[in-house]
Amino acid sequence: MSHKERPTFYRQELNKTIWEVPERYQNLSPVGSGAYGSVCSALDTKSGLRVAVKKLSRPFQSMIHAKRTYRELRLLKHMKHENVIGLLDAFSPATCLAGFNDVYLVTHLMGADLNNIVKCQKLTDDHVQFLIYQILRGLKYIHSADIIHRDLKPSNLAVNEDCELKILDFGLARLTDDEMTGYVATRWYRAPEIMLNWMHYNMTVDIWSVGCIMAELLTGRTLFPGTDHINQLQQIMRLTGTPPASLISRMPSHEARNYINSLSYMPKRNFADVFVGANPMAVDLLEKMLVLDTDKRITASQALAHPYFAQYHDPDDEPEADPYDQSFESRDLDIEEWKRLTYEEVISFEPPVFDGDEMES
């Protein structure tokens, strides 16, 4: 594989899938599979760490698949931050572009996600501060690269025993309507403007999700468990009140404006009455996150400086990302072109320097 010393690969069948990986990865054990690939845990004999090896499923099956494969690889390669999942290795058993059909990505093996944590224990306010601080610290970094997560929810937040958190699966979500229909967690954390196509959305769709997650950590229950889009919006407005005229008039969608105007007026509730017993600083922050008007919603950077995080906030240790070139998003290339670009990204991958201080879960 060009300038890299090519390792020795070995083959093994797991769950009716052939895995072909470098010898440094041993003890492969299936941990799950989804639409876009299967994941095994493995021991990385080089670092001594348990890692997650993901084999992408039919990465170049269609133009959409091929572009998504390229997107995932580019995003993961770019992310170098303690609170964001990054890439430890990328490889393919192929020795040339002509034989390049499989892509494998290696990341840290994350133990629990925030869902497990919430179910198991009532969190103290200090726990909530630390967890939400880390989400916002990761988001500041992601947003500074002009990347929007779009699908932040408890299952996309990995947490280890020390309460250290990493954001997973960002920037990939281009969710279809079917995936958002019905009583689904995917939608419960979604900002109303993205769920209902109100208008062009911005980075703060992720802040809305953080507000929903933070409320859930404080109360132990889902904030807006809507049964469908309409019920979800009703639950949201019971808290936020109906959108002000100034916001409705800025919605490009005629349908959206008509629908909102047809709703009976609802006043905004006093958040202190809803989150009884919560730290007043936490309530104040929630009020700034769960705002219908995206122009008035707090940003990740601003939220980090909120007094609620006084014991964690350190402006010198909340880094931003290098610029991320995503001009490829507007390109319509054929499968072979996306494949060639992906191949180049795989062979040019430089593994991170292991500092011995990485989080194990």
From Swiss-Prot:
BP terms from Gene Ontology: intracellular signal transduction; p38MAPK cascade; positive regulation of myoblast differentiation; positive regulation of myoblast fusion; positive regulation of myotube differentiation; regulation of transcription by RNA polymerase II
Function (record text): Serine/threonine kinase which acts as an essential component of the MAP kinase signal transduction pathway. Mapk14b is one of the four p38 MAPKs which play an important role in the cascades of cellular responses evoked by extracellular stimuli such as pro-inflammatory cytokines or physical stress leading to direct activation of transcription factors. Accordingly, p38 MAPKs phosphorylate a broad range of proteins and it has been estimated that they may have approximately 200 to 300 substrates each.
Gene Ontology molecular function, alphabetical: ATP binding; MAP kinase activity; protein serine kinase activity
Domain named Protein kinase: residues: 25-309
Keyword Transcription: yes
Activity: how regulated: Activated by threonine and tyrosine phosphorylation by the dual specificity kinase, MKK6.
Processing after translation: Dually phosphorylated on Thr-181 and Tyr-183, which activates the enzyme.
Tissue specificity note: Predominantly expressed in the ovary. Lower levels present in brain, gill, heart, spleen, kidney, muscle and gut.
Entry annotation: catalytic residues: 151 (proton acceptor)
Protein name: Mitogen-activated protein kinase 14B
Domain remark text: The TXY motif contains the threonine and tyrosine residues whose phosphorylation activates the MAP kinases.
Phosphotyrosine found at: 183
Cellular component aspect of the GO annotation: cytoplasm; nucleus
Binding site for ATP: 31-39, 54
Cofactor requirement: Mg(2+)
Motif TXY per record, residues: 181-183
